[in-house]
């Protein structure tokens, strides 16, 4: 009786089928190949890697740019005339695109690791191209609308560089397995040497990268200065409508030590608080004065301005997704807000022993108060009941007519040297965070210059400026900064040097070990492709019987197909197998 034995037993390769199936729609074993990938597929792999790096950069940009989302929406509003949170579709598309490209890249790396031929499915090729082109168009659009925001990338590295360095080092170390497997192959080529050289350069650059870092929070904790004072920029605009009394009150409730407001002069000489050039976004002027909704806000008189509602827009548009957190009483109060006058805000500052930072928009030349706007502002300051001592705490921003307002603290938002500030009688400086380098901050603080940095809405940026010694920051989110009792991370120089050097040494040791292991593995093992099977009669005696049985079964099936009932015999002669009909003989 002949015992049947399978001609060939295939081991199930579920994971390989999953990888090749999703990446290239090669679900069956016969569809796969372990040959070298074509140049066309290698080019697509490069495109995939480039898309991943671009999306990684794009995602990181929007992660750190959260600090300025309000400014971005305001810029878009000034261009389109419609107020919408434009960051939501951008963040959603970036998340989807980055997840998709990352998943495909992981599958491609598994292909390389498993020795499978790359073959990206045509649907994925369309998806990769669409994602790449969409991201490029997004980068171009942001550069056009919001080009100065790229500076936040360099600023953020002051906080994230040590951690990005560790992550990048771990990634490059892991990739060494694939690089080593490619380089130590028997076939030598110039491309292999180029890949090896590029890898070594990247690895060494990462190891030495911390020499270029400037991280204010790498310092002795005993040298840390008190936390910067928080100025409520237009109050607390994330919790209540900007530049309204309820917004300023909320800012003070959340620990703001000062208030900042945007001042516009009405046609009858009354200073009021308004950020935009028109009243469309933050009032119901389109309902009350539909024919004047695009008119400059300064050409309305105070009676007309006071008749407008300045809170309902906040409840309807919910610009910061915070309306749901408000109580019914708070919503009712916000819904009844009117445009705030400068005098009201200054009286609130006087009652709470707070100072004020005023950003005054000079009226256009055809405005009736064009030549007397500063006198109107001074009149409101004096009328608010603030004593002469308290008047000095009110900051005067415009550079014009400084000699006529010596009673107020002189400031500028232009970056000047200490000597030039002294010559112009300026004692205070308000700078955008992108213009306030660590070196500049140290110089201003050492010369007793009152420095305020804006806008600071995220804990990481607040921590950097705290470690740098900035005395005060202007923020749209005092409720967020209130929850930062200490810098989010602080490390001594010695501790960081230890972490840096240790991580570099561990990485180098692992990379060298991987290259040595791959070299030993390649030189000590014979690589056979298990899917290529050749039946040969000239085999070792230990496997001869198995091969004979396989051949018997093959010819038995052939004979059965021809209708023959004779028994299959095998006669070996001179080491070869001879087949005949009849009995089985030796």
Q: Can you annotate each of these PLM segments?
A:
Residues 1-586:
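Phosphate-group recognition and catalysis centered on beta-loop-alpha active-site segments
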